[in-house]
């Protein structure tokens, strides 16, 4: 037994040798002692070993594409085409990482010489249709670091704005600066259509926030060892850098691509679609539905450079949400907006309900504003602002009903008083 002093009244840790007065807690075992600091150190070592053994993609039991799609169905309404494409692309990406982790590089070279490449994803579609939410939900299911960046803030190196390496800094921050975890994460770059080349023909003037950003993104999309400044901002020679390999980072880029449907429709013209169509018949594809028929040449004409398009082999489209889909978004997902507000009112001991007419009116307003699902919360917040101000101070309200008239502005929410037990611990009559 480790003791200090002649009287033997002071004990010390058997691992670090600190006395019981130097540590917060000393735990006794059969003939040994361990302090709280050594216990914390042991926990960190165990966590590091577990995380290093999990390098095969963040998920030991990788869900199949159908399982991934079913998970997305529980959180995201509609967009079946995008969900299927995303599920297949993500499954293949992490399956490739797992296979490379399980087979040494030397053995891979001795086998058939086939090296699996990375397939980044391009998502097209108007705002508020679920592009960002799909990527976030997929990352949450796989338990991998997720970072989101805005392409409009990026500029070519050497100009005012953010370097593309700052995207990887956000990924490192999401992984708590665990480089190994960050190297298997997912990055979503929004507003990628805003960095399209300003003109189809190359210009003699430098396009630092358009084509210049596309050029800067090429290497990290394909896979390179990037030097990331840990404090962010611009690089300078005296700064320390964190090296991160982007070979196994999955990049999902998205944008509204307003005007791309016109380019597609012009290319398609009035030619009949399909193999069995009557040669004399014609069908014109217009509007956002045309995005599903996009080809690389359409993206090039829009303003993306060929090298950038080539690094985004998986292309899918999300479509505008109609009234029916918006009503479903309000009630069906696990994290539905109505459930969120019901939970918020429940914390004050008040029951909140929405009538069918109210749900339809919220959807109609969102369609009229053209904000998609992103505008639903703003509409509910506007309607409930006065209610959320009054109700916490009133003991005579136990139920609030949101009606169609309250949404349209022709009336107000109904306050009801029924004997419902409050979370505050009292009854209201």
From Swiss-Prot:
Q: Where is the ClpX-type ZB domain?
A: 1-54
GO CC, alphabetical: HslUV protease complex
Record protein name field: ATP-dependent Clp protease ATP-binding subunit ClpX
- Which InterPro entries does this one have? AAA+_ATPase (IPR003593), ATP-dep_Clp_protease_ClpX (IPR050052), ATPase_AAA_core (IPR003959), Clp_ATPase_C (IPR019489), Clp_protease_ATP-bd_su_ClpX (IPR004487), ClpX_bact (IPR046425), P-loop_NTPase (IPR027417), Znf_CppX_C4 (IPR010603)
Gene behind this chain? clpX
Q: What does this protein do?
A: ATP-dependent specificity component of the Clp protease. It directs the protease to specific substrates. Can perform chaperone functions in the absence of ClpP.
Sorted UniProt keywords? ATP-binding, Chaperone, Metal-binding, Nucleotide-binding, Zinc
Molecular function as annotated in GO: ATP binding; ATP hydrolysis activity; ATP-dependent protein folding chaperone; protein dimerization activity; unfolded protein binding; zinc ion binding
Which species?
A: Cutibacterium acnes (strain DSM 16379 / KPA171202) (Propionibacterium acnes)
| Lineage of producing organism | Bacteria, Bacillati, Actinomycetota, Actinomycetes, Propionibacteriales
